[in-house]
Amino acid sequence: MNGHLLLLGVQGPELTAEEAALFRKLQPAGYILFGRNITGAAQTRKLTDDLRDLSVDEPILAIDQEGGRVTRTKDIAPALPSANALAAKGDTLLSARAGMLTGDQLRLLGFNLDFAPVLDLDHHPGTQNALRGRCWGRDPQRVIDHAGSWNRWLRKRSVRSCAKHFPACGRALSDPHFDLPVSDATLGDLLKEDIIPYTALMPELDAVMLAHVLFPAIDPDRPASLSKRIVTGFLRDQLGFDKHLVLTDDLDMCAIADRYRDNSDVVAAIEAGNDLAMICHRTERAEAAAKELGKLSSYATEGAEKRLARFRKKLHGPLKWSETKWEAVCKEIAELAAQVPEEAAVLPNSPVADY
């Protein structure tokens, strides 16, 4: 079995005996937590500690903590401002402070990887494509300035970062949680605009997440997340992201789950050049997925295993838990949020904010 090429979700706020046994057996690369796992600060820290205790190697402990409506700690702490609200203020120092406080918050809770910043250009700001409020803007330089400042200070707080959603989920006109978006953008279109933030920030990024978007002009058969042309040919070989950890977005989204059966998505992800396949919700399929990955040749997984080992060496352990420190960070977050109010808007009906 190749469980170490999986990143898995957890079902609730504490591990069940069955989950603990499964995770101990599979030894996945790590875990992602959502709002369903977070009911209190001390409880969340215990959960991340328990997951660490199950792992032979330091596990990836990840979360989507972007700010705004994608704030997994919204039930236990004030929400940090969204990327859109921060960039609208035009002050990169505010973006830097948001990154710093995100890092402080996550390390106290036991996380070592944040699936942020979003580097998608906001091509369709009013569209139901799951990204409303989550992008730093339409202009690549604005994204570089603000996402770069945010990312730099997150990493200075010893939390690793993951840019998303490569190559350009901002081109999507629909929500991959519901269906597979299709974009007519060519490789030239992407290089002209969407890829600029990735290449500009390359030395400061730890990981890259692939989008569930189909680009027929580049690969008519596979979405970006499962496309060898995009993952290996474009991201790694052409752009030079050959040292970064690369992983799929959640393979349980309908964009993928409705089209791939019997864990063929997991195999396709690794064969495409991803290092990790992410299963966030249907963890009951994790053991079967690991068995399918075990059928891959060592040649097919060698690069992923090397990059994962290198990535693990960059992970930092959690800060010593302190209720006093937690309350102090929450107070600073509330003060920043008061400086950067969110625009009142009708947000799209996407599950992204509810997990």
Predicted feature locations:
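Short, conserved phosphate-binding/catalytic loop or strand-edge motifs used
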Residues: 119-130
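Catalytic domains of carbohydrate-active enzymes, especially glycoside hydrolases
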Residues: 21-34, 101, 108-113
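Short, flexible, mixed-charge acidic loops at enzyme active sites
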Residues: 71-80, 125-127, 168
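A generic, well-ordered mixed alpha/beta core segment in the N-terminal half of proteins
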Residues: 75-110
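Preference for extracellular/luminal or secreted protein segments
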Residues: 1-29, 257-355
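Flexible, glycine/proline-enriched loop segments at strand-loop-helix junctions
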Residues: 87-93, 132-141, 180-189
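Second-shell residues forming the walls of enzyme active-site clefts
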Residues: 9, 36-54, 59, 69-71, ...
